[in-house]
Amino acid sequence: MLSIKDFTSNLTRHARNTEEKRNMVLTILNSTATKREVRNYLKKYPLLKDVDIYSKGQMDRSSVSKRNKYSSMIDNLMLKHSTNNENNKIEDFHLNRPRSDLISKSKLEIKLTDTLRIAIVKIRQFRDIDPTALKGIAFTLYKLIKLGVSPIVLLDTDKEVQALNGESDAMVQKSIANYHQQALSFINIIEKCFHKYEDDNELSARAIRGLFEQKFDEDRFSMTLPELLLIPISQGIVPVVYPVGYMDKGSKNVFLSSEAVLQCLATDLKSLNDRHRLDHDKENLFTIEKYIFIDPLGGIPSLERYKSAHVYINLLQEYEDIVSELYIGFLKTGERDQHLKNLNLLQKLLQVTTDASGIVTTPQIAMLNQTDRFTNPIIYNVLTDRPTISSSLPVDLKKTPLLNTSIIRRGVPVEVYVDESSDKSGLCLDSLLKRGALDLEKLKNVIDLSFRKDLNMKKYLARVKNNVAAILIAGDYEGVIIVTWEVTDEEKPQKIAYLDKFAVSPKAQGSTGVADVLFKSLLSNFENELFWRSRSNNPVNKWYFERSKGSLTVTGTNWKCFYTGKNYPSLDRMKGYFNICERIQPSWNG
């Protein structure tokens, strides 16, 4: 029978949870720029679970906490798979496991109502992070769980791995034991943040040991017991993965590099989910959505951004250029090597889980509360799948902030064909068609979908023939840009670059970053001068305005003219822009 005290306590809990739900919904609405982003988020992530005390007409009066329930379950699981009880003492990190091939073929003993959306969080130099920052990171982890994300934490031990190279086994075991104590201290700190709350609002974490093993006939470590991870995350508990692996050869435990651990997690979890999809009509058991690197150095630095971080990195297009830039010499060797390590590791991980995103930020930024004044880039990226600012915003504008967070995706390749002739005679479209570099059907399709109109291709090609300055194609025509040479009516006519078509397919609009990737590439190829026109009532004009040096209304028309580039146009030049905007005839059917 419920007492008055129980009832009052649960009313308080109900009010707090109701307020938390309200605040979470407001966070989503305030952080997402479009209805599409809200829909995409809610479609992917299960929002706060119903914790109403009136659900099912009764209250859960279990005196066993969620963590204790989990501890019992996991201990039983470990015992079940152990064949030698002597190796299961708490001081020993090795668990005798069943054969990997049998485990991989067995059915996972977990049934979920929602797909788990996993974020793997790597924290570098966690011992040097002050307790206040750790508490802030704990609240970010808590917020992620409430937003439907399942974090897995790895405390980076790469320094230990390097320092122990060539040391005795006894020294390695001593270091592993020391790491164990530090990991428990980390768990204790983040859990203490929530001791003032009831059980349903606590943040629980669990040390996960004995997860990795290298067999005699294998050249890499593998995850032999996925339940060790999936049971806690399915209950909203944060697994803290030990970077320790057992080697059959030599029967010993060794420290693993963060790269080895993360690649093992990414590869083995993906393989497990792929097998699940085969047996369950392509339904996902879980997906890896984010790789979050919390690093004192922050995001990957950019010279263009005055050594602040790249906002967004499209690996398939930018990786080699960024690596080359990091070797120019504007960074200390140690810093450069760490940034390269982060970039290279994320490139490898995103080759395995191609739809995931990487986030590299600092502990101070990772602990930010999501408020009207501050934007936590981790929370914001979960809600929108975008960086906090657009990567195509001009760097030199005062309103464009310099950040220390990089969002990294495998992205899309960008094919760029630019007229490099001295007389600006234009690209030879026939040559591009014969080489298979240009597909007119796909080109027309993406333009039609983007503009919601029917392009008269014959009429359009007749107008731009011998005048095409550039064609940029993102991926498999997820987006295209066509730039033409247009002649001014000045006393000495000149050909200038005019952005004629900028189209992004509806599926690629928003969080994919295709528009930003294309526009950045466009500006890098036409950095001196570029202009374009847009209908005065075009909702995209705000986006254009933020990326242009200026805009003017073309008198007597419904056109707005935008311009950008290093060369500031004279009054006569602007008149030339206006004349071109007025005389170009649309090439639409109907």
Swiss-Prot record:
Residues 427-587 form the N-acetyltransferase domain. The keyword Acyltransferase applies. One of its GO terms (biological process) is ornithine biosynthetic process. Pathway: Amino-acid biosynthesis; L-arginine biosynthesis; N(2)-acetyl-L-ornithine from L-glutamate: step 1/4. Coiled coil: none annotated. The keyword Transferase applies. GO terms for cellular component: mitochondrial matrix. Its EC number is 2.3.1.1. It holds the Pfam family NAT. Keywords: Acyltransferase, Amino-acid biosynthesis, Mitochondrion, Transferase, Transit peptide. InterPro entries: GlcNAc_Synth_fun, Vertebrate-like_GNAT_dom. One of its GO terms (molecular function) is L-glutamate N-acetyltransferase activity. It is an enzyme of class 2 (transferase). It is found in: Mitochondrion. It comes from the Eukaryota. It catalyses: L-glutamate + acetyl-CoA = N-acetyl-L-glutamate + CoA + H(+). Belongs to the acetyltransferase family. N-acetylglutamate synthase involved in arginine biosynthesis. This is Amino-acid acetyltransferase, mitochondrial.
